[in-house]
Design a protein with these regions (language model features):
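Bacterial Sec-dependent N-terminal signal peptides
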Residues: 1-30
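Short, surface-exposed linear motifs at loops/turns and structural transition points
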Residues: 21-134, 138-147, 152, 160, ...
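An edge-strand/N-cap motif at the start of beta-rich repeat modules
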Residues: 37, 48, 129-145, 154-155, ...
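Conserved short beta-strand element of beta-propeller blades
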Residues: 48, 63, 214-241, 249-251, ...
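Predominantly a core beta-strand signature of beta-propeller blades
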Residues: 74-76, 118, 161, 210-213, ...
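Hydrophobic core positions of the immunoglobulin-like beta-sandwich fold
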Residues: 92-93, 98, 144, 164-165, ...
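Repetitive beta-architecture junctions, highlighting loop-to-beta-strand starts
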Residues: 245-247, 257, 288-290, 335-337, ...
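Short loop/turn segments that connect beta-strands within beta-propeller blades
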Residues: 252-257, 295-299, 342-347, 385-389, ...
Length: 481
């Protein structure tokens, strides 16, 4: 059909070239559909041509588009009046994707409509290429790349519809990630175009975690160092140093959200090794002490026999009836690399070996039973298996250096709030991988002076780095939104 149309066009043109130019009568005109020069999911661009030996009065010309060759109820591309022969271009941008169409040129002269032979074409189906980022907070911009995407496309994150903020050239859609439905934190990303649904292979994952202010801390607002630990559902913070040593603790009852003063009948100490239920070692600012403190079920401090070593800033884990003590510094200021274990039943200490790393309470640590994890100054993560006495290097921590604290909830470890950072990270024990969580309120340079972990929540004590603003206790729920 296209070949026959072109033959007619050239024959008609040849007739005009060899015809007499002496007459001034208005010429006859023919119209041809030439080439489909562009087609996508919803856009068609096509050229046509009016052929005439002279001027001609055309009241309208353009193209007709239809899904049927009979052109019943066609889409009209009207290009208006015309008086001279030549090429013309038409465009239409609201076609259905993945559909077969017919297009033909037309002109109207002397009240009569002439049409060309039809050209058949097909619009393209929408395709998805990728999207980024694949891990982000709700409300942030997500960019979707594809082909033949239409302006009326809809984007869904799981069951939630996203708001489209920008559409570019059928190839890019920018959306705001919607708030997730309850429990839907790893969701498919679907793009619906003309009723056709395309789904990305990789799920989108929300950065989740809920921070909220739980209480204001009643201690001295000017303190810069303290001793903190937890015991039987209560949080302990004390031994504050704000220029003058404070020889007491504040206890926080999580269930009632109340603080109470707790007298301490021992000497003032800083930088001890702390664990869930007490602390040991440290310094009284003049020398390293060998004190060892536990708490009974009523929360009273009990002085155990002195430890057989002198350490500050050691790392301690209580697992069952055993207390493991790692690293720290000795009385000469040198890094200690010993691993010790104390049994609360036999009251005996033993040395288990040495560590291949340098660690202290200045660096984050956490444990999953007898498997203990340590971050180094360079953010390397090491695991110690107390059952086998083996060390293994794991996935490096991706956050800022200088992070503190550390805790375990379920199958995940938590570390964060490094130097000038409000980021919290979650470590997956099974996958050996890190994932960012929601940032804590406040300022990047706020100081973290306490970290406590319960069965399903983390409590963090934060204070401004400058001035004497009150410290605040924040609660973090890692699986909430």
């Amino acid at each position: 059909m296209r070949l026959l149309s072109r033959i007619k066009y050239f024959l008609f043109l040849s007739l005009f070239l060899f015809s007499s130019c002496e007459e001034e009568l208005e010429s006859e005109a023919l119209v041809f559909a030439e080439d489909v020069i562009f087609v996508s999911g919803e856009i068609l661009r096509i050229t046509g041509r009016v052929v005439s030996s002279g001027t001609v009065t055309i009241t309208d010309h353009g193209f007709q588009i239809s899904e049927s060759p009979e052109f019943s109820s066609p889409i009209i591309i009207s290009l208006g009046e015309r008086s001279i022969p030549g090429r013309f271009i038409g465009s239409y941008g609201e076609l259905s994707t993945g559909t077969d169409f017919f297009v033909r040129a037309f002109l109207i002269t002397k009240g009569e409509t002439s049409v060309s032979e039809a050209i058949e074409f097909s619009t393209l189906d929408p395709e998805l290429i990728d999207y980024a980022p694949v891990f982000e907070e709700a409300g942030q911009t997500i960019t979707i790349n594809g082909k033949n995407l239409t302006v009326d496309s809809e984007v869904f994150f799981g069951s939630q519809r996203a708001t489209i903020t920008e559409f570019n050239n059928e190839a890019e859609i920018k959306v705001r990630a919607p708030n997730p439905a309850v429990g839907e934190y790893s969701v498919s990303v679907r793009v619906i175009t003309d009723g056709k649904e395309n789904v990305f292979d990789k799920n989108f994952e929300y950065i989740i975690g809920k921070w909220q202010l739980d209480s204001n801390y009643p201690g001295d607002p000017g303190f810069s160092r303290n001793v903190y630990f937890q015991h039987e559902g209560k949080l302990y913070s004390g031994m504050e140093d704000a220029g003058t040593a404070v020889q007491l603790f504040w206890t926080y009852d999580i269930s009632t959200k109340t603080w109470q003063k707790k007298d301490f009948n021992g000497p003032y100490v800083v930088y001890p090794g702390v664990y869930n239920g007490g602390f040991l070692g440290g310094t009284d600012t003049n020398s390293i002490v060998k004190n060892f403190w536990t708490l009974d079920q009523s929360g009273n401090f009990i002085a155990e026999a002195d430890v057989p070593f002198r350490l500050v800033q050691s790392v301690s884990f209580k697992v069952g009836d055993d207390l493991y003590v790692f690293g720290g510094q000795n009385e000469f200021g040198a890094n200690n690399n010993s691993i010790r274990k104390y049994n609360f039943v036999s009251k005996e200490w033993i040395v288990l070996g040495t560590m291949p790393i340098v660690t202290s309470s200045r660096f984050p640590s956490f444990n999953l039973g007898n498997q203990m994890y340590f971050l180094t100054v360079s953010n390397d993560l090491w695991k110690y298996d107390a059952n086998t006495s083996q060390w293994e290097q794991m996935a490096s921590y991706p956050g800022a250096t200088g992070a503190i604290g550390g805790g375990t909830i379920g199958d995940f470890g938590y570390v964060g709030l490094g130097n000038n950072s409000r980021e919290m990270f979650e470590y997956d024990f099974v996958l050996d991988s890190w994932k960012r969580k929601t940032i804590i309120p406040g300022f990047n340079n706020d100081l973290t002076l306490g970290w406590f972990t319960t069965d399903d929540e983390i409590f963090v004590l934060r204070k401004p780095s400058r001035g004497t603003g009150a410290s605040k206790l924040y609660k973090f729920e890692p699986f909430n939104f």
